[in-house]
Amino acid sequence: MRFWSRIALVMALFATAATGAAAETPVERGRYLVTTIGACGNCHTPRDAAGKPIAGRELSGGFEFEDPGLGHIVGTNITPDVETGIGQWSEAEIVTALRDGKRPDGTLIRPPMPIPVYKQLSDNDAAAIAAYLKSVKPVRNKLGEAHYKVPLPPSYGAPITHVPEPPRDDKVAYGGYLAGPAGHCLLCHTPPGGGKPFDMSLAYLGGRELPDFDHPGGIAVSRNITGGSKHGVGEWTDAQIKRAITQGVREDGTRLARTMPFEWYKRMAPADLDAIIAFLRTLKPPGTE
């Protein structure tokens, strides 16, 4: 009897392992990145009059907002609709668009698409995002016209050829990957400076003016999220930081603007939240103590 109990236990363990492996196919990994930490729908999903994402039209573009530094922005359709989306793009072309900021016709993608950090998406994660985007329901959505205040950058640098997998067994390093390339927290929470759109000497120190998604035409200013500084979130508990990320509520109970994509972040894996917080705790900017 004990022998068969052990056999049953082994079979259960194998079944659990198989289930876990199945959830990490490229499409499943891509779904996770797009719909949680990547929060692609925060810009690429249209919203109703109350500012809520419209169900059934996910990633079809059409969300319009005023960016104080860039101009009138219109989120593009990234569903595989052939006429109005990216249905004619190959998965390799989607990866090039993500990491090199270049469309199949050779034109450059404008900000606020976070190309500067997407350049460091791992090969597997970039491919997973592309695979997922090709798998979603095509939605036809003819978009309005964007109007920019600033010219296109001349380029986003040399083409990306290879980015290795991030070290998931290193909690802090993986948290840095999630906060940077995967979740692009880095871009919203890093101010411009020195004639550059992002002053990396002030990374995560906040102060960047962003569109306020709760008040059209309004401005939201990103906060300092360095976790090793009393001027950032260093005096917040882990639970308070998690609540801000996943519910949009500060430590004092006030609400964050929906520019912060907590509606997507709330579906993030607990281990990924822990990794991001562990990374933020290591940030101790000079001159902030």
Can you describe what each PLM-predicted range is?
Residues 7-17:
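Bacterial N-terminal signal peptides
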Residues 19-35, 50-51, 154-180:
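Electrostatic cytochrome c docking/interface patches
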Residues 59-93, 116-126, 203-244, 262-273:
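Electron-transfer interface patches adjacent to heme c in soluble/periplasmic c-type cytochromes
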Residues 90-104, 117-142, 237-253, 261-289:
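C-terminal capping alpha-helices of c-type cytochrome domains
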